[in-house]
């Protein structure tokens, strides 16, 4: 830690740091905001879904509670659960289906599959996992970053992500969230 920051307890630390901005904001598109400014591009099919970590592997999006006792009070815009789920869905659609120029890896397809499972979309979940198996897994079931490369790179992430996505789907046969 910074030598100038002296705290004796978690409460003291919380009192010294600037309150964090709300963890979530919705763009005019409407999609989840990834940056502090509106720079979302619906054509950006980049493989990372860091702005959707609250959807998967987290649960802050599907279990969103808009009550002031949870979200706090202040000048930030308040959202309801339906708006949050819709924005996460739009963001996931904007990031593509794993066929974009930056989508060679199996792990991102497994992550997308798990995110679709969280949203209760079984057909897209199945498409993503089937596509990952077809495009990124060898006969020995090792995941390769780019199987068409003459010297392909083994990448374990998809091997862990695939069963994790299946477990999410098994846990969420219809919907992982209840619209209240």
Language model segments and positions:
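Active-site core of glycosidic bond-cleaving carbohydrate-active enzymes
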Residues: 1-179
């Amino acid at each position: 830690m910074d030598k100038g920051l002296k705290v004796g307890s978690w409460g003291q630390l919380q009192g010294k740091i600037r309150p964090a901005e709300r963890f979530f904001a919705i763009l005019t598109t409407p999609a989840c905001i990834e940056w502090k400014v509106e720079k979302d591009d619906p054509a950006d099919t980049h493989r990372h879904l860091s702005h959707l970590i609250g959807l998967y592997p987290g649960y802050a999006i599907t279990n969103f509670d808009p009550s002031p006792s949870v979200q706090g009070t202040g000048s930030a815009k308040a959202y309801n659960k339906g708006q949050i789920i819709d924005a996460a869905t739009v963001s996931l659609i904007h990031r593509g289906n794993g066929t974009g120029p930056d989508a060679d890896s199996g792990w991102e397809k497994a992550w997308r599959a798990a995110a679709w499972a969280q949203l209760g979309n079984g057909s897209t979940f199945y498409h993503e996992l089937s596509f990952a198996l077809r495009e990124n897994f060898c006969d020995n079931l090792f995941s390769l970053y780019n199987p068409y490369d003459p010297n392909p790179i083994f990448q374990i992430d998809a091997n862990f992500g695939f069963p994790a996505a299946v477990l999410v789907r098994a846990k969420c046969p219809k919907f992982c969230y209840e619209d209240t």
